[in-house]
Amino acid sequence: MKNLKKAALIALSALMTLALAACGKSGNKVVYRTLDEIRDSGTVNIGVFSDKNPFGYVDENGEYQGYDVYFARRLAEDLGVKLNLVSTEAANRIEYLQTGKVDIILANFTVTPQRAEEVDFALPYMNVALGVVSPDSRVIESLDNWNADDQMIVISGTTAETYLTENYPDIKLQKYDTYANAKNAMENGSAAAWANDNTEVIAFALQSPGFTVGIPSLGSQDTIAPAVSKGNETLLSWINEEIRALGKENFFHADYEATLVDTYGLDFEDSLVVEGGQTK
């Protein structure tokens, strides 16, 4: 009888371990579609930004455009399925994967150890760091002597929010849910500066006269990569092979020249683009 009870406890423990492995940090079951299920359905759902020009945005004709969108279209084409683009915000990228609302996230998703506990990242396709933009009238070039009365704009759920909270806890953060709202706040003078991916603040300054990126690189050098639900091994493996194959045709340089060159010019191309998942 004791042996039977012991065996039952071991079996129960194993089942609980498997159940936990299929759950995110919130304890909710992670839902995803395998590669075959996506192909059988005829449609892939990819999460992108809709307000973050030039990476993911909706143009004047109501069409999605941008660096991430260009990549998403190629993924769908090579999968042999239709593409359904799903508008996402920084704070809900992980949630959209875990609940099965999207199959893949391509929304300027910076790879971090914390995020890798909740989603699986594929090979990278872009380099990135944090940057800080501020008005020309008072350019912020360092955070070490921050004025206690000033506030810093960040977007909730971004690496900028995490980095500043951990490394500069005394800086007051003015948080927004969307890129568009953060951009409007900066233009309206709601805060002294705005911290975000350097690619994004550089683009903002180039498109908005009167602003300067005083801190072009803050914190560590990171990468941006596609993300899938934790445990979705078949889809992850396919994306990695796809990125390697695309590298042989310099796909991401073509993507840059089609979507980013008007904003950044050619000077940033080789430093930002990652081909074949291989960082320099």
Language-model-derived ranges and their functions:
Residues 37, 134-152:
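Flexible hinge/capping segments at coil-to-helix
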Residues 127-134, 202-243, 262-280:
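Periplasmic-binding protein-like
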Residues 27-108:
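Extracytoplasmic small-molecule ligand-binding "clamshell" domains
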Residues 46-50, 121-142, 226-230:
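Hydrophobic/proline-rich hinge and linker segments of small-molecule sensing/allosteric domains
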